[in-house]
């Protein structure tokens, strides 16, 4: 399989991701993900889960590059990716469009399965190791956690994306099947 190079990958404007659609939006926001293989895996997961797009910060985060393209296994062709200068302003914009902003944090009290993912939602995932920046976490409408049952206290960010996005997809499928 041939992978598109990052040179041919184009960012879209945030408003392209936020365009109204027939279904409630499910948007992924990444706060400082720096590993290109993680971003590639997240692109692949986001495409498979049917998200509307991914929004990343312009600084202190990996952008689209050849490693991301290869790690995405072709998903870079289909997922809309936008860059923004300020995630906190983005969160304000999302809220103004009645999109719930749900961050992930190991310190959260709500389990990710307790959130109603059928709502218009932007899922915010933090950087490898450090998680969400303090202001980003404070600006989220709600924080959820993925419970850990072993001795390690967190998942890789790309794995966490898969766990939560597919819970959102599961809940959305339940409402459309009824």
Predicted regions and their residues:
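Post-transcriptional modification and biogenesis factors for structured RNAs
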Residues: 1-178
